[in-house]
Amino acid sequence: MSIKLIAVDMDGTFLSDQKTYNRERFMAQYQQMKAQGIRFVVASGNQYYQLISFFPEIANEIAFVAENGGWVVSEGKDVFNGELSKDAFATVVEHLLTRPEVEIIACGKNSAYTLKKYDDAMKTVAEMYYHRLEYVDNFDNLEDIFFKFGLNLSDELIPQVQKALHEAIGDIMVSVHTGNGSIDLIIPGVHKANGLRQLQKLWGIDDSEVVVFGDGGNDIEMLRQAGFSFAMENAGSAVVAAAKYRAGSNNREGVLDVIDKVLKHEAPFDQ
């Protein structure tokens, strides 16, 4: 048995809480991964244009499962993207606009879009996660391929809002809790696990040859799917239950510590 693919979530997993990682250590590991024929995949709810900014030297060598699986890119080339029909998009927007407690980001292939009327605090956060972001008066007549919505709201409202969204638009989109004060609406079945499946099919890699890392609700499907799945020390109970193993904290390079074990064929990678 040999590992052929390593996939990492970013926020709360690969990145510290300061949104950094040990670049020198990782780049040394990446060279060893290449030498051992191991593919590296970034699997995140974040926008592709934001994700590539973390890996400027190797963005055209590695793969990205961006937007929670909505858009999959390998070596700079499209592998897959989901697409909401115009009718489905309009139905979702119509419902979301009846919910004043949520701020809406419509996630498209060319850009993300949010409303000009939102306050500066929301816009500052949005710009951190969406490097291509347009401010619009409304969501009518936008020409793009849409595969996700990002919703910002108060943490304490998330359980009840998720329940309400499921009842209202659950046949069109699935809500996943992605972290502090945020929910993503994704196309059913178009999640990180599906994105990894597209890449595995392309490369001829079995689930048993895959290592994944995650900490949030949007990681659960890929944690269940992979042969070697690691929930971070900072992960919630549902995520821990979905994973086979635990990794250290995202603030103490927990992912990089496990990658060292992969490269050295140490337990549990020594079968």
Swiss-Prot record:
Entry keyword RNA-binding: no
Keywords of this entry: Hydrolase, Magnesium, Metal-binding
Cofactor notes: Magnesium. Can also use other divalent metal cations as manganese, cobalt or zinc.
Cofactor requirements of the protein: Mg(2+); Mn(2+); Co(2+); Zn(2+)
Cellular component, GO, one term: cytosol
Residues holding phosphate: M10, S44, G45, K192, N218
GO BP annotations, alphabetical order: riboflavin biosynthetic process
Reactions catalysed according to its record: 5-amino-6-(5-phospho-D-ribitylamino)uracil + H2O = 5-amino-6-(D-ribitylamino)uracil + phosphate
SUPFAM superfamilies cross-referenced by the UniProt entry: HAD-like (SSF56784)
Pathway connected to this protein: Cofactor biosynthesis; riboflavin biosynthesis; 5-amino-6-(D-ribitylamino)uracil from GTP: step 4/4
Descriptive protein name: 5-amino-6-(5-phospho-D-ribitylamino)uracil phosphatase YbjI
